[in-house]
């Protein structure tokens, strides 16, 4: 049965038993895998096959479904967004369409995602990896505030890897292939997390063509010559040259979610990506955190200075005549230090002759 984020204990007594929160990511914790991809690329089937593969190895995963619109999840799920937010009720209540309702559900789930992180941390010793299946409409997750919050929350807590699923059958079209690679590049530079491109449906079309296109520009150029649209050819050719550097450091895996082919390679790529997270992402995260702390300190000092200046101006404007205000302040100080006994002459002074 799926766990609900709301059901996580949060009493002070239970919280006191837990270790104090860490200042940075726990690099020794099991990794989380964010599964992204275009609609129809086979994300859910991929998660199903990977879940079965891990169970067969006696290393079960912790599975989270973040797609509120799916009618049936074909794998055992530990946390299900549908238990927290009702997709159809959101559409009905707010008068939204499918995409708007998905984004609203993610926004609502996002408000409780700290509890999901706590569940992941609590169960970490019981699973090998945490798999997160995202909505079919990729833009609803990757380009929304809630998607960024979920991704950043995971990445700042423990090792996190992004898997981008590509439909190999559709990618045989050079233009579609380039669209997928451009989208993958944008997600990589947006998240800055270790990134794996998974060419799915290898049982239908062997994705070796895609690997050759990524390694050799001339092969991709030859494939473009067979296409009809000259405008798209020129654009794809230009983009291919631009993305050449992107291809160099990109991990790629070819799999078939239908037959189970290539999933050993998936696990190897995950292990390599976790090491990349430790060596590349964590130092970058700590640097950004230190810079933010420094900026916050500078902003605090500026606010304090502005507050003091504002108070001085306010005190000066309390009277219509500043000179009278200063004179009254001076008299007030004199009164505070006046010891008395000099307002009247004493007897000896009175007997002195005055010229």
From Swiss-Prot:
Pfam families: ATP_bind_1 (PF03029). It comes from the Eukaryota. GO terms for cellular component: cytoplasm; nucleus. Keywords: Coiled coil, Cytoplasm, GTP-binding, Hydrolase, Nucleotide-binding, Nucleus. Residues 286-311 form a coiled coil. Residues 1-30 are annotated as: Disordered. CDD domains: GPN1. Signal peptide: none annotated. It is an enzyme of class 3 (hydrolase). One of its GO terms (molecular function) is GTP binding. The record marks 99 as: Stabilizes the phosphate intermediate. GTP binds at residues 40-45, 200-203. Disulfide bonds: none annotated. The keyword Cytoplasm applies. InterPro entries: Gpn, Gpn1/Npa3/XAB1, P-loop_NTPase. Residues 9-21 have a biased composition (Low complexity). Its EC number is 3.6.5.-. A motif (Gly-Pro-Asn (GPN)-loop) lies at residues 97-99. Its main location: cytoplasm. It is found in: Cytoplasm; Nucleus. Small GTPase required for proper nuclear import of RNA polymerase II (RNAPII). May act at an RNAP assembly step prior to nuclear import. Belongs to the GPN-loop GTPase family. Heterodimer with GPN3. Binds to RNA polymerase II (RNAPII). This is GPN-loop GTPase 1. The gene is gop-2.
């Amino acid at each position: 049965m799926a766990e609900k984020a709301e059901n996580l204990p949060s009493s002070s007594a239970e919280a006191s038993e837990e270790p104090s929160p860490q200042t940075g990511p726990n690099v020794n914790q099991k990794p989380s895998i964010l599964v992204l991809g275009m609609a129809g690329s086979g994300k859910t089937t991929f998660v199903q096959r990977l879940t079965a593969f891990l169970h067969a190895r006696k290393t079960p995963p912790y599975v989270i479904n973040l797609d509120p619109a799916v009618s049936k999840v074909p794998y055992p799920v530990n946390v299900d967004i549908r238990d927290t937010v009702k997709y159809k009720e959101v559409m009905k209540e707010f008068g939204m369409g499918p995409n708007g309702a998905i984004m609203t559900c993610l926004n609502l789930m996002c408000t409780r995602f700290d509890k999901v992180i706590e569940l992941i941390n609590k169960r970490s010793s019981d699973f090998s990896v945490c798999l997160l299946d995202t909505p079919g409409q990729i833009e609803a997750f990757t380009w929304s505030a809630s998607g960024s919050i979920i991704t950043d929350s995971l990445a700042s807590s423990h090792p996190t890897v992004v898997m981008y699923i590509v439909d190999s059958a559709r990618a045989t079209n050079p233009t579609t292939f380039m669209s997928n690679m451009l989208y993958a590049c944008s997600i990589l530079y947006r998240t800055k997390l270790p990134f794996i491109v998974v060419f799915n449906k290898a049982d239908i079309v062997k994705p070796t063509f895609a690997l050759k296109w990524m390694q050799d520009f001339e092969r991709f150029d030859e494939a473009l010559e067979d296409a009809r649209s000259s405008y798209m050819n020129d654009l794809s050719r230009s983009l291919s040259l631009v993305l050449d550097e992107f291809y160099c450091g990109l991990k790629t895996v070819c799999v078939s979610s239908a037959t189970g082919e290539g999933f050993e390679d998936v696990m190897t790529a995950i292990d390599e990506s976790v090491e990349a997270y430790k060596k590349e992402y964590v130092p970058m995260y700590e640097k950004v955190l230190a810079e933010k702390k420094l900026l916050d300190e500078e902003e605090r000092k500026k606010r304090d200075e502005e507050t003091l200046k504002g108070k001085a101006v306010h005190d000066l404007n309390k009277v219509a005549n500043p000179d009278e205000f200063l004179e009254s302040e001076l008299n007030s100080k004199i009164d505070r230090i006046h010891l008395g006994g000099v307002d009247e002459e004493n007897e000896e002074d009175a007997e002195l002759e005055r010229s």
